[in-house]
């Protein structure tokens, strides 16, 4: 197409023929494409961090296959009474569901549940766990999550711990509950909150941490993305996007909680701790999490820990959507048997966990680490590519309506190449976004699809290469026009459209390089 365009332009009567023949044009465009791809590859490598997770070479070894808690008493089942109570908080109240076992001799232990990110109301949260505990003779309280101070962008785990301590105090005050045997059960995000509660309130009798991230949310997110992508089978080049996406500041601000470190609070925990993971949970650092909890509580002089791994269970110790019966048995037995069950052997038992890499601190992007700047750059460039041609057409339309003679037309070959450059640049950005969304859906569904994962990435890269080819063709045409003495554009609007489009497309190509479209193994 390139050589044909130039040949056609040379045949237009009255025009000076641009220097160079068809073969030279092809050579220059091909050479420009190669050079452009290499330059973009180098820029992409230099602009941000690489993703080189550190392999875990010293895995945690289970001491027994059975997760059963030795010495755990067998109690119940007891009939259960349910009531809804209100928990007064600072500035508001939340409802909570209390389950109380009936017919138990003496006061019973109690458990307050702390929500993760995926739950919020007691009707849907911890139903199986609370009922199993209550039927075994343990009072339970599941509060609604306070939502007026909890958003996607803003949440404060220390303040949330203070709210949950109100639920703890309420359960301890109920008739029939032993105030010295009330503990907390926290799952997922809640495992960043429960250690704060335990550190600040030593009257908490025990702590259960289920599917605990342990590391800060930013590290856990990068680890989870890496695990999901490996399970999905994406090309190695895609992994470069992990630190650049997870490490940047999120557009619009907020998300300070992403760097909250729970370790200082875990190092003040003196309560017995039950740590539980499902070995099919790809989102959590199964080995690292348990090891860090053991090390952290040891700093407080606490050696009362129990770690359990459940075969085939995913996040929340669920198998096919239901909480593992073995986990419910172990949970109720461990709570009922305290303090004796707090340090019984085996300390670490169940399915052997596997963790390929450490959930380490995420490298920070050097150039495009500000999400607001990145979004502004992409949207601004796309806007220019779309609006600048419209501006030129508007000027031509106004001239026509006024009966004015239109300005001399621009070079048609250059116009076609600019249109191709604009279309391929924007098209590659759209294709990349589509690919990342499609891969995310596959990853979250634990699915594989070679056509999307491998074929989609190949398609994105080929489209990106077509954009570089179009850019090279534009540069070659500009050079030929300049050498032949012809104007590159006509009028102020023409120059604005030409150079504005070139600058916008160049910005898009650099952004694509940043996200790995032009990687060459460097």
What are the language-model segments listed below?
Residues 170-230:
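Primarily recognizes the serine-hydrolase "nucleophile elbow" in alpha/beta-hydrolase
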Residues 3-10, 27, 302, 312-314, ...:
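Alpha/beta-hydrolase-fold serine-hydrolase catalytic core, especially in secreted/extracellular enzymes
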Residues 130-150:
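Conserved alpha/beta-hydrolase
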Residues 269, 275-277, 281:
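Short beta-strand/loop motif that positions the catalytic acidic residue
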Residues 119-130, 145, 287:
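The serine-hydrolase catalytic nucleophile loop
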Residues 106-116:
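Short beta-strand element of the alpha/beta-hydrolase
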Residues 51, 58-106:
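N-terminal cap/lid segment of alpha/beta-hydrolase-fold proteins
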Residues 154-175:
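Alpha/beta-hydrolase active-site loop
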């Amino acid at each position: 197409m390139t050589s044909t365009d130039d040949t056609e332009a040379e045949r237009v009567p009255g025009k000076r023929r641009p220097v160079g023949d068809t073969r030279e044009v092809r050579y220059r465009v091909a050479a420009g494409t190669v050079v452009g791809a290499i330059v973009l590859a180098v820029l992409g490598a230099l602009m941000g961090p690489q993703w080189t997770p550190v392999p875990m070479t010293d895995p945690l070894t289970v001491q027994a296959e059975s997760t059963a808690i030795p010495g755990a008493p067998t109690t119940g089942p007891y009939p259960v009474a349910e009531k809804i109570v209100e928990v007064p908080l600072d500035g508001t109240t939340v409802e909570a569901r209390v389950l109380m076992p009936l017919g138990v001799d003496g006061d019973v232990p109690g458990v307050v549940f702390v929500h993760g990110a995926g739950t919020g109301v007691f009707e849907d949260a911890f139903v199986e766990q609370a009922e199993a505990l209550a039927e075994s003779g343990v009072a339970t309280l599941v509060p609604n999550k306070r939502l007026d101070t909890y958003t996607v962008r803003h949440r404060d785990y220390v303040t949330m711990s203070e709210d949950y301590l109100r639920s703890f105090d309420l359960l301890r005050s109920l008739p029939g509950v032993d105030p010295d045997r009330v503990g907390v059960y926290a799952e997922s995000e809640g495992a960043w909150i429960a250690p704060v509660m335990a550190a600040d309130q030593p009257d908490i009798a025990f702590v259960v941490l289920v599917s605990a991230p342990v590391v800060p949310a930013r590290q856990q997110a990068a680890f989870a993305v890496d695990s999901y992508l490996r399970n999905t089978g994406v090309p190695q080049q895609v992994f470069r996007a992990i630190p650049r996406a997870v490490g940047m500041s999120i557009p619009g601000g907020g998300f300070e909680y992403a760097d909250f470190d729970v370790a200082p609070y875990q190092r003040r925990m003196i309560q017995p701790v039950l740590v539980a993971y499902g070995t099919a949970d790809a989102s959590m650092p199964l080995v690292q999490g348990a090891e860090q909890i053991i090390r952290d509580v040891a700093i407080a002089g606490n050696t009362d820990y129990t770690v359990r791994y459940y075969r085939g269970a995913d996040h929340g110790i669920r198998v096919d959507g239901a909480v593992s019966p073995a986990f419910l048995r172990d949970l109720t037995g461990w709570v009922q048997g305290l303090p004796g069950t707090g340090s019984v052997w085996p300390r670490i038992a169940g399915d052997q966990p596997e963790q390929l890499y450490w959930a380490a601190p995420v490298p920070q992007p050097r150039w495009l680490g500000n999400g607001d700047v990145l979004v502004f750059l992409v949207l601004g460039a796309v806007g220019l590519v779309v609006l600048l041609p419209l501006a030129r057409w508007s000027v031509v339309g106004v001239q026509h309506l006024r009966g004015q003679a239109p300005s001399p037309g621009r070079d048609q070959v250059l116009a076609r190449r600019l249109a191709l450059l604009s279309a391929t640049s924007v098209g590659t950005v759209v294709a990349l976004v589509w690919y990342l969304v499609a891969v995310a859906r596959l990853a979250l569904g634990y699915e594989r699809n070679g056509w999307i994962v491998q074929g989609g990435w190949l398609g994105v890269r080929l489209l990106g290469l077509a954009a570089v080819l179009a850019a090279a063709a534009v540069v070659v045409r500009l050079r030929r026009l300049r050498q032949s003495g012809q104007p590159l554009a006509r009028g102020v609007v023409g120059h604005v459209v030409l150079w504005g489009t070139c600058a916008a497309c160049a910005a898009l190509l650099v952004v694509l390089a940043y996200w790995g479209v032009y990687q060459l193994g460097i």
